[in-house]
Amino acid sequence: MCIRDSIWNGTNPKFSWTIDGQEVGTELSYTYTPTETGIKKIVFTVTDTTDEPEMTLSKCITRTNETRATLEFTVECHSEEESHRRPASGASSATWDRVYEYTPAPGQFINELVSGGFTGTETSPEAAVAYAEERMKKNTWVSLGGWGGYIVVGFDHSIDNSSSGYKGGYNFSITGNAFKGSSEPGIVYVMQDTNGNTLPDDEWYELKGSEYGKEETVQDYAVTYYRPTYSGADVQWKDNQGVKGKIDYLKQYHDQPSYYPAWIGTDSYTLYGPCLKSRTYDQSGNGSYWVNGEYDWGYADNFGNDRLSEDDNAAAGAMKVYFKISNAVDKNGQPANLKYIDFIRVQTGVNAKAGWLGENSTEVFGFTDENINQGK
């Protein structure tokens, strides 16, 4: 298991990782390889040399009057990888079973009552999940908003990392609506239910795609979105590269009061993950015709070669992209070698906007176990 925090604005930070009181690492990230079962207490400490360090950690912190911040958590180690595997049976459904979380970034379809399908009553995380479930049960798209927005789903069984998957080992698919010139790539993650509690609270593994490891891909990216102070306003954001921007309010197309998710109670929230280099450009040169270019493979809602279809999807209908569990990697980029998965997460992978078309936002219609479905 690889653990890594995000530090913003530290001048000269020094890091310390301890397990049960013993220091085991001094870098920003630490790879923990358990040697026994049981619960371990892990403490991460950041010490900065300035009088007033400014830093943000990706989890709750305890801050002293000194230049120090600590993060403390526990890890429960289990023995057999197969111990919580849920084999598929004749009664298993090939499609997703449940939405566990729906946390989009702000976007033109968020809170939108017409094409977005919101009712105006989605004011809690539970209501947002119910909205996403209802949409996908009808094979209708759910928008993840701008960069970093995500959805988490599970199945009524474990999906095997099987070489007998569809067309040479594709184990599952995610349905989007990409077509030539309109790709809004979503980065895909998978998880095993390692602790057996049927919840997606174990370790996520990214499925590497064609852009993984490239210099222009920012692997440790983060964006903070800020709630607008009045109706009809743009949503301001700031990333961990020092860049500021906004999700444009497009009144002529989507005039709901706010594009900031109504069920997020805080005045700002931060999303984390990789960011792909945008391939959005103005082909017309005058702002009238924008293109969202595709990526080779490995992303949801993308017109790549893993569509396994010659259909150009000119009508922007529902279209599958196929994925292999064998492409899962850990935080260090090493193969995860998962035998099966239980949960899937998709996250909008680019921070870009296309003029009057608005922000790039991944859309998903559904998730399918292709070991069972075989491309049907």
Protein language model regions, located:
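Surface-exposed, flexible coil segments in extracellular/virion-facing regions
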Residues: 16-33
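Conserved small/polar residues in nucleotide/adenosyl-binding loops
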Residues: 1-5
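Short, solvent-exposed loop/turn segments at the edges of extracellular beta-sandwich modules
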Residues: 47-64
